Amino acid sequence: MNRNTLHVMMYSHDGFGLGHVQRNLGIARRLLELSPGSNVLVLAGTMPPDTDLPAGIDLIKLPSILKNGTGNWLPRTLSIHKDELKSVRSGIIRHVATTFRPDVFLVDFVPTGVWGELKPTLKYL
């Protein structure tokens, strides 16, 4: 990695719809306009269909979650306990942070992530 460029990591929990990840992708595109050559890695629970990502932006899909009618977060498609899914998602996020080494970590909407899944990463950073 060329450490002369800005590395930005973004997080969108995205348990319902695509609004959060779309907002982060808009911010990422604007960031590249203002700081050409930057690298932006977006971690999200949903993958927007047919998203044309410019050079410098990429997206990592986290295992999906959903918010049920009582406001509780649950695995969307995997038949595992939410604590196990939290561990999987948290581990992916932490691994990306340790290898990508972002200069900036932007979290959309839920400051410590769903179930607090960002706490290990925030502590590391």
Over which residues does each language-model region extend?
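Structural motif
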Residues: 9-10, 106
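Short glycine-rich anion-binding loops that position phosphate/pyrophosphate groups of nucleotides
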Residues: 16, 65, 110-112
